[in-house]
């Protein structure tokens, strides 16, 4: 009985899916007064020999939200359900919908649609990354590099978890401002020419900023070891201060400054300050 029910449910699912595709295929072109054209990068690895292309979609701005992600969702729901992209929070927090819109790396969920209907908006996946499908880049290398910096607090003194807090003064905590807010969207790294050509060795702006976040943390005891892993000509020093990373960051952070601080620590121009003593009444 259960097997038969499963088979029926699967059949209904296939029928529903087929109806959805048929409806999308016959969707009428929008006829409103404010029709915006989007050219979207398309690539399907399941089509042998198929080459990437730009496909045009028209959207009625009077029946769509104000953000580019709203337009993408509308296109997927009403025109072409095969259009593939990442998205989650829809409010600039998760970093999932990072892509190249009108020539700039940004988040689709916080990028306003250009209201000039005479101009076509072109949308590509993040540049210089392998493309899985359409607007979905392969982030495996990026996340592997992030894991390589060991992005967690490391203590050399024995502590009993839950026994007490790790003290950090207000001034010490302020050094982390503008660092921990990074959402790992990779907009900055994908905008960096040095990362384009040396991604296998150069860690890139996003990962280096996260590395500095742990290096400078007064509670962390492994700054020397963290810096030692970057004592080569590529990990950090391939940054040529082009500043694309800072310009494109959707969170308005400054990866270039963090990389500069790492370089000064590596060359002994600076040293990490000793942590302030824990107050007696803490």
From Swiss-Prot:
It comes from Ascaris suum. Expressed in adult muscles (at protein level). Residues 172-202 form the 4Fe-4S ferredoxin-type domain. Residues 1-21 form a transit peptide. Inhibited by the fungicide flutolanil. The lineage of its organism: Eukaryota, Metazoa, Ecdysozoa, Nematoda, Chromadorea. GO terms for biological process: mitochondrial electron transport, succinate to ubiquinone; tricarboxylic acid cycle. Binds 1 [2Fe-2S] cluster. The keyword Transit peptide applies. The keyword Secreted does not apply. This is Succinate dehydrogenase [ubiquinone] iron-sulfur subunit, mitochondrial. Optimum pH is 7.5. [4Fe-4S] cluster binds at residues 182, 185, 188, 249. [3Fe-4S] cluster binds at residues 192, 239, 245. Component of the mitochondrial electron transport chain complex II composed of four subunits: a flavoprotein (Fp), an iron-sulfur protein (Ip), and a large cytochrome b (CybL) subunit and a small cytochrome b (CybS) subunit. There are 2 developmental stage-specific forms of complex II which have the Ip and CybL subunits in common. Complex II from the free-living larvae (aerobic environment) acts as a succinate dehydrogenase and is composed of the common subunit Ip and CybL and the stage specific subunits FpL and CybSL. Residues 39-129 form the 2Fe-2S ferredoxin-type domain. It comes from the Eukaryota. It is a peripheral membrane protein. Its EC number is 1.3.5.1.
């Amino acid at each position: 009985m259960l097997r038969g029910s499963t088979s029926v449910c699967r059949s209904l699912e296939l029928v529903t899916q087929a109806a959805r595709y048929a409806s999308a295929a016959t969707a009428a072109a929008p006829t409103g007064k404010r029709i915006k054209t989007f050219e979207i990068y398309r690539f399907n690895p399941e089509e042998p020999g198929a080459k990437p292309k730009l496909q045009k979609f028209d959207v009625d701005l009077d029946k769509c939200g104000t953000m580019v992600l709203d337009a993408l969702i509308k296109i997927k729901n009403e025109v072409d359900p095969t259009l593939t992209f990442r998205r989650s929070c829809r409010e600039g927090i998760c970093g999932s919908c990072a892509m190249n819109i009108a020539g700039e790396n940004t988040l689709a969920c916080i990028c306003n649609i250009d209201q000039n209907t005479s101009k076509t908006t072109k949308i590509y996946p993040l540049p210089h990354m392998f493309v899985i499908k359409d607007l979905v880049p392969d982030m495996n290398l990026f996340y592997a590099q992030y894991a390589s910096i060991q992005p967690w607090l490391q203590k050399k003194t024995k502590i009993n978890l839950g026994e007490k807090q790790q003290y950090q003064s207000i001034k010490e905590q302020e050094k982390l401002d503008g660092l921990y807010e990074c959402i790992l969207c990779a907009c900055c790294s994908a905008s960096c020419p040095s990362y384009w050509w040396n991604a296998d060795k150069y860690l890139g702006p996003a990962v280096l900023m996260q590395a500095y976040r742990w290096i400078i943390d007064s509670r962390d005891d492994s700054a020397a070891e963290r810096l030692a892993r970057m004592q080569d000509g590529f990990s950090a020093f391939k940054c040529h201060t082009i500043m694309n990373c800072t310009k494109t960051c959707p969170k308005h952070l400054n990866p270039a400054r963090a990389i500069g601080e790492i370089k000064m620590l590596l060359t002994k121009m600076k040293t990490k300050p000793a942590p302030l003593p824990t107050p007696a009444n803490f």
